[in-house]
Amino acid sequence: MTCTIHGQSSQHKENQLPDWAFGGFERPKNVNPVISPIENTKFYCPLTKDSIAWESNDTFNPAATLYNGEIVVLYRAEDKSGVGIGHRTSRLGYATSTDGTHFKREKAPVFYPDTDSQKELEWPGGCEDPRVAVTEDGLYVMMYTQWNRHIPRLAVATSRNLKEWTKHGPAFAKAYDGKFFNLGCKSGSILTEVVKGKQLIKKINGKYFMYWGEEHVFAATSDDLINWTPIVNIDGSLKKLFSPRDGYFDSHLTECGPPAIYTPKGIVLLYNGKNLSLIHISEPTRPY
């Protein structure tokens, strides 16, 4: 049996962390942003058959990991093919750093929609929002969103060097005879553990474990890190582990972030909490 621990403190206790929490984060001064859009990096898109300024509009929602002693950041980049996030094409860029603040970037994306088996699910919206974790034997597993501008699907890819990737398709394609294939889903956080200074993918009771979801937090298990089975209730509906809370910073959505971490005090999951734009009628200063 596993449990997820997440913060419940209100805005009045925002600096008081429980003893299980990770805290003390600080924003380095005068270094941000560390990766920004660039107009002059071109990429020949195999689908449009044209040279694209692939990272000219946005660079955001990155994943970070270690490879050969360097920090590697895989970041989502959007071109200027449309207006508004999600209406352009996303590809994943590759950047390295030895200090965490100064980065060297590849000129071409390392992961993108192509003339492959995933084209129908990734074009024209692209490949979005990577989360990366690694096994003890050095296999990098990336959860990302396939976006064809109809249904966002949580998908899996693997690599040994973070540049050459094998796409495995939607994470839930085979679960329950394909019941969740057309489910809109994203944001997969695979469970990890810090072992001798390395953050590695961990099994629970012989299975890999993943938290996922954008509006609510759900969970899934896997035997091979490729095919995932969502955890469901007795009636077959998805089991919600936690959801948005009225009157808090996460009143609109609770979206899984980087890989969850198993600790002696429980599993720590960092998530993106977004509040509604409404104002509580009895407290005009509090978002609801």
Feature names for model-found ranges:
Residues S10-T65, T101-A133, K163-K202, W228-Y262:
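Surface loop/turn signatures of beta-propeller and other carbohydrate-active proteins
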Residues R91-D99, L154-N161, F218-D224, S282:
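Beta-propeller blade signature
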Residues G138-N148, A155-T158, A171-A175:
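Intrinsically disordered, low-complexity linker/loop segments enriched in Gly/Pro
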Residues V73-L74, G82-D99:
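Short, His- and charge-rich active-site/binding loops that engage polyanionic ligands
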